[in-house]
Amino acid sequence: QSTPYLVLSTVYTPPPSSCDDTQQMTERSRLRLEQMLPEIDSFRQAKILTQEEATQMIERRRFLEERLDDSEGAPEKYYMEYADHFSACNKLIRKRKRKTGTKCQKGDIGLRSATLHLWARYVRAFRHRPEAWMKYCDYLSSRNMHHKLQQTLAKALALHPRVSTLWLRAASTELRLSGEVSRARGVFQSGLRVNPSDPTILLGAIKLELDFADGMRPSLEGQGVDNPSLRLIVDGGLAHMVLSHGLGAMRDQTEVRGLMGGLVSVAGEFSEVPFAQTVLSQGEGLEAWLVGMRQGRLAELEAERQRAAKEKAEENEEASSTEEEEEEE
């Protein structure tokens, strides 16, 4: 049986070993363990952990650290097992602190820092996988690290702008944290600029507007306000506009069909909103209704294009005429 290789002090001293250099801890692993010592030692001094528990904790972390460094492209499983270890430590320490009434701010900060560092290493290693970013977001959300969560979502979207689930997560996070529909709306607008016909993002944006309309309706009707602009919003006008623009970006009727099931489902959640009622009332004629809306939007876009081209031609003609007059002078 091997002797404990680490004494709870501010200095890490590796045990004697007959292993060659490739089997010993890397300098990075050793440094990380040294950085964790103050955290674990503070819990021991506060009598939240016993000496034996603290030593076992360090031994476990050494094993987990070495395994990550020894593996070329360590599998995700190794990172998740390390994260589970930190989670178990956190639960144990919180339970002991509640039981004893003891506080240990230094240890808490150290444990949180070590956990965040591990997650940062994880998303660096698996940055090409959107699922890895979602797992990190789940962790940050569970710890109420709101600012860090927003920063992480921004980084994830910069790497994976085509992943619709990340846009949905970012929009729901903004709405939950700020309580402002405009913030979530801005996220969806950014997502649709990059993915103009993505059905998941489009349905998320429509659902946001229907929810907004449904929330405003009781207040508006209760106050008896007769404002055409507000009435348009309450009737689902913004949701109608989002749908129209999304349909205009779709390449063909196949994409329109792919939207139908989700649209009916979303409309069913807000059946009191007039626009949702219109969607639901289409029945088997929904596809034809959507195709007609798409054609109308395409006609609007063509009219806008022609108008812009005409204005540009007039500007060029005016500029050319001005140049000729200057030359004559």
PLM feature spans:
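Polyampholytic low-complexity alpha-helical segments
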Residues: 3-329
